[in-house]
Curated annotation (Swiss-Prot):
SUPFAM superfamilies to which the protein is assigned, alphabetical: Ribosomal protein L1 (SSF56808)
Family: Belongs to the universal ribosomal protein uL1 family.
Any one of the GO BP annotations: regulation of translation
Function: Binds directly to 23S rRNA. The L1 stalk is quite mobile in the ribosome, and is involved in E site tRNA release.
Chain's gene name: rplA
Gene Ontology MF annotations: rRNA binding; structural constituent of ribosome; tRNA binding
InterPro entries per record: Ribosom_uL1_bac-type, Ribosomal_uL1, Ribosomal_uL1-like, Ribosomal_uL1/biogenesis, Ribosomal_uL1_3-a/b-sand, Ribosomal_uL1_CS
Highest taxon listed in the record's lineage: Bacteria
Protein name: Large ribosomal subunit protein uL1
Quaternary assembly: Part of the 50S ribosomal subunit.
GO cellular component: large ribosomal subunit
Length: 230
């Protein structure tokens, strides 16, 4: 542990904690200070000026990042009839009806995202207490409750990420891997930031983008200057 701590301290010493960097500088620095011995994820955290206790200031949705996330997402689709073949053709890893409800109730979780057609939500609803806490419950706001299972699966496989403001108004999301080029990460970041800007509740007052930071898995955080943000 001491060795890991030393590596982190050396990496952290390259980051000026009092400075707010441009998006380009922050992403470059985050990559340079990655200490993981694997292709680490690049994560961002937006602290928004919202009150999540108010229903009209809940922020949740999904966006397809132009360069994907670098992660392979396993997709489970609850569907029936011709929607089963449609989901399979789109690349879904698992497709079915009640049999998967039973498997999940028995502790099976070999998937990352759940999609369901509206007519299956009666069955999927039985899993609310299991899927909800894990953030896996299908939701119309994120496009995971839909009859267009083809589009839903293809977007997830292409690099769609879900975002949701937590209690403190913080949105966490992955925008790629350290192996991505700076340009790919910047483009992904800008896409996510633009979506969050457009999602600003009309009732939110004061500064919206309160603070933003980028980091890699196990690496130090790098603050981003939000002055130019909309």
């Amino acid at each position: 542990m001491a060795k890991k701590g030393k590596k982190y301290q050396e990496a952290a010493s390259k980051v000026d904690r009092t400075q707010h960097y441009s998006v380009e500088e922050a992403i470059k620095l985050a990559k340079e200070t990655s200490i993981a011995n694997f292709d680490a994820s690049v994560e961002v955290a937006f602290r928004l000026g919202i009150d999540t206790r108010k229903n009209d200031q809940q922020i949740r949705g999904a966006v397809v990042l132009p360069n994907g996330t670098g992660k392979s997402q396993s997709v489970l689709v609850f569907a029936k009839g011709d929607k089963i073949a449609e989901a399979e053709a789109a690349g879904a890893d698992y497709v079915g009806e009640a049999e998967y409800v039973q498997k999940i109730q028995q502790g099976w979780f070999d998937f990352d995202v759940v999609v369901a057609t509206p007519d299956m939500m009666g069955e999927v609803g039985k899993l609310g207490r299991v899927l909800g806490p894990k953030g896996l419950m299908p939701n119309p706001k994120t496009g995971t409750v839909t009859m267009d299972v083809k589009k839903a699966v293809e977007e997830i496989k292409a690099g769609k990420v879900e975002y949701r403001a937590e209690k403190a108004g913080i949105v966490h999301a992955s925008i790629g891997k350290v192996s991505f080029t700076d340009e790919q990460l910047i483009e992904n970041f800008n896409t996510l930031q633009d979506v969050l800007a457009k999602a600003k509740p009309s009732s939110a007052k004061g500064t919206y983008f309160k603070s933003v930071a980028v980091t890699t898995t196990m690496g130090p955080g790098v603050k981003i200057d939000t002055a130019s943000f909309k």
